[in-house]
């Protein structure tokens, strides 16, 4: 749960990236970044011919901080696809966070690209020390048994269920309205 005096940012990295800033438990600002999981998944899918394999590649990719990055770049052939998108997202998110009239105390990461290992360390490094962590549903107990990636998949499942039940915003990342649903009634 968010503390009343805490100013936070939520970076949702799905098709496109959304940065939501919250202050005093109220949404203050929502901005979008055109880069997102879609461009990474599309690029990997073009080589692998499978979106599920592209997702698994992201899930099994580990990114490293500046000090140890050079030793591991050969380890994953898709780092060259994933890192530029994450770099764009993190730098634009940093600009958005720094432009707020109040200091952001914590950044939560969520969405498809948050399955990349060490992504919170990568964002912390670029956002200069603001604490970053993966957004976890409040009702799931934290324990060493639960893999952080399970939280991310639970977040996605909850969002899909809410959309499927007709709640939430129909134009958000998880549910696309059919063209016929967008037409005004006559």
Protein language model regions, located:
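Hydrophobic/aromatic-enriched cytosolic interaction surfaces used to assemble or bind macromolecules
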Residues: 1-186
């Amino acid at each position: 749960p968010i503390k009343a005096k805490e100013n936070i940012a939520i970076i949702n990295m799905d098709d496109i990236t959304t940065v939501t800033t919250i202050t005093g438990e109220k949404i203050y600002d929502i901005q979008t970044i055109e880069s997102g999981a879609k461009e990474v998944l599309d690029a990997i899918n073009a080589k692998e011919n499978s979106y599920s394999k592209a997702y698994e590649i992201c899930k099994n990719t580990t990114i490293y901080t500046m000090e140890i990055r050079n030793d591991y770049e050969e380890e994953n052939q898709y780092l060259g696809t994933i890192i530029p998108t994450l770099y764009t997202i993190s730098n634009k998110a940093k600009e958005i966070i720094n432009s707020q009239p109040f200091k952001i105390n914590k950044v939560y990461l969520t969405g498809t690209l948050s399955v990349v290992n060490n992504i919170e360390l990568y964002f912390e490094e670029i956002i200069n020390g603001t604490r970053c962590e993966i957004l976890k549903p409040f009702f799931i107990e934290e324990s060493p048994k639960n893999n952080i990636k399970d939280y991310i998949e639970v977040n996605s499942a909850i969002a899909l269920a809410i959309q499927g039940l007709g709640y939430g915003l129909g134009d958000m990342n998880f549910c696309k309205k059919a063209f016929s649903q967008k037409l005004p009634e006559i």
